[in-house]
Swiss-Prot record:
SUPFAM superfamilies membership: UDP-Glycosyltransferase/glycogen phosphorylase (SSF53756)
HAMAP family documented for this protein: Glycogen_synth (MF_00484)
Name of protein: Glycogen synthase
Keywords on record: Glycogen biosynthesis, Glycosyltransferase, Transferase
KW Transferase (keyword) present: yes
A Pfam family hit: Glycos_transf_1
Keyword Transferase assigned: yes
EC nos: 2.4.1.21
Length: 474
């Protein structure tokens, strides 16, 4: 059972939602895969008729909840944890419409985690229980603890999509969350409790969403205070990395959001898409390169570096189109660039799926100077559409961008390193044969979920085989 706090079919706050929509489907040809997700208002609005099929009992301060079930049009079964009090509210899965975290997030996601453990134990009345729990990030991580603390033996795999989000709560909540007093230390994190740490300690296996990120988080620079624990798990062979895939809908030959389609052997559609992007962002017609930024506008994503090098890009004849939202200070910096360079820099603060896809389909380069990147999906979307990533060599960007072949990498998250990389990109743009060869290589790079799915199937079997109970996946 795939346990997750967001799923792009219904509601999405980040790349986790895309993974949750794609990975279970990539595995269904082999196993009976089902998904458990909270019953947010957006989920219920899109789910249609929900059949009540089970119920989980209250635990400490965690309320009892009904379990609903729907089946997607492609046959994927979805269990929905129903609680009007906890989940039916405005906002994203994690924050209110004002942008602040919900004060009861600990109760909300502990309830989700406990429900997963109860389903695994066969105590939810479903007439079915999974042979393995696949838990995703801190909102679901505590399920591994609830399984172990109740004497359960269901194998648990925990996937860390972003180690920076750890689900921190005060020690005073331990009793309310139903954590046994003798197990509280498993969650200890510098004077607080961490849901994610509890999952890392209790899961049978931990994986991250790229091979390089799995290595990086075992060191202090990227370990977010959990590096020693993760290094210990890695030493026992219980920490691995699998690069995410992207959905098959990202196909420039058929994409529903594109008016002008193209293929690896037929480029003309890219020019039409570029013209559309320039018009949408108020950019002048130009024969120079078009740089896209499709990102949250936050420090982690290196947006401050982009703002620093923007004058160089414009001076060299390039244009920049930015879509995204995030930290107010960076949003203001981007807005100032549009005022300083009208017709050369344009921005859309917010997000619109169709516009983002057209940017990938029309831009020449994608700017992605992330300070850290567990996997990253934008670089793979860009490659699929012939847009070459210019990326900081970190995490999944190392694993997915072949420097000088399918994009460009720079080694240090600094303005000077990014400037030197931009010079390489401009030189490539002035060599049409090289630019075409790189675009072709990028578009042909294998990045579908079939590759990642096979690796997850092997990891499921390994996790089940090495769990204490020696359970087997059906």
């Amino acid at each position: 059972m795939f346990v997750v706090s967001e799923m792009a079919d219904f509601i999405k706050a980040g790349g986790l939602g895309d993974v949750a929509a794609a990975l279970p489907r990539a595995l269904r040809h082999r196993y009976d895969v089902r998904v458990l997700i909270p019953g947010y208002r957006a989920v219920l609005e899109r789910a249609g008729k929900v059949e009540i099929v089970g119920r989980v009992l209250a635990h400490a301060a965690l309320p009892a909840c009904d379990i609903g079930r729907i089946v997607q049009s492609d046959g994927l079964p979805i269990y929905i944890l129903l609680s009007k009090e906890l989940f039916e509210r405005d906002g994203s899965p994690y924050v209110s419409t004002s942008g602040s975290e919900f004060e009861d997030n600990a109760i909300r996601f502990a309830t989700l985690s406990h429900a997963a453990a109860q389903i695994a134990a066969g105590h939810a009345g479903l007439g079915w229980k999974p042979r393995l729990l696949h838990l995703n990030d801190w909102p679901c991580a505590l399920a591994a603890g609830y399984v172990r603390w109740s004497g359960g033996t269901t194998p648990c795999l925990l996937t860390i999509h972003n180690l920076a989000y750890q689900g921190l709560v005060p020690y005073s909540m331990a009793a309310a969350l139903g954590i046994p007093a003798e197990r509280v230390a498993e969650l200890e994190f510098y004077g607080q409790m961490s849901f994610l740490r509890g999952g890392i300690v209790n899961a049978d296996h931990v994986n991250t969403v790229s091979v390089s990120y799995a290595k990086q988080i075992t060191g202090p620079a990227q370990g977010c205070g959990l590096d020693r624990l993760l290094a210990g798990r890695a030493a026992k062979g219980a920490l691995t990395g699998i690069v995410n895939g992207i959905d098959a809908s990202w196909d420039p030959r058929t994409d529903q959001y594109l008016d002008s389609h193209f293929s690896v052997n037929q480029w003309q559609g890219r020019q039409a898409n570029a013209a559309q992007v320039r018009k949408a962002f108020g950019l002048r017609e130009s024969a120079g390169p078009l740089f896209a930024v499709v990102s949250r506008l936050v420090h982690q994503k290196g947006l401050d570096l982009i703002c620093e090098v923007a004058p160089q890009i414009v001076a060299a004849g390039g244009q920049i189109a930015v879509i995204g939202g995030g930290e107010p200070e960076i949003e203001q910096q981007v807005a100032e660039l549009t005022r300083r360079y009208p017709g050369q820099v344009g921005a859309f603060i917010g997000f619109e799926e169709g516009l983002a896809r057209r940017m990938f389909a029309g831009a020449d380069f994608l700017l992605m100077p992330s300070r850290f990147e567990p996997c990253g999906l934008s670089q793979m979307y860009a490659q699929r559409f012939g847009c070459l990533p210019i990326a900081h060599a970190t995490g999944g960007l190392i694993d997915t961008v072949d420097d000088g072949v399918t994009g460009f990498l720079f080694q240090h998250a600094s303005v000077e390193a990014l400037r030197r990389c931009l010079e390489r990109a401009f030189r490539t743009f002035r060599l049409p044969s090289l630019l075409s060869a790189m675009r072709r290589a990028a578009m042909l790079r294998p990045s579908g979920w079939d590759v990642a799915g096979k690796k997850y199937l092997s990891l499921y079997e390994h996790t089940a085989a090495t769990a204490p109970a020696l359970a087997t996946v059906p």
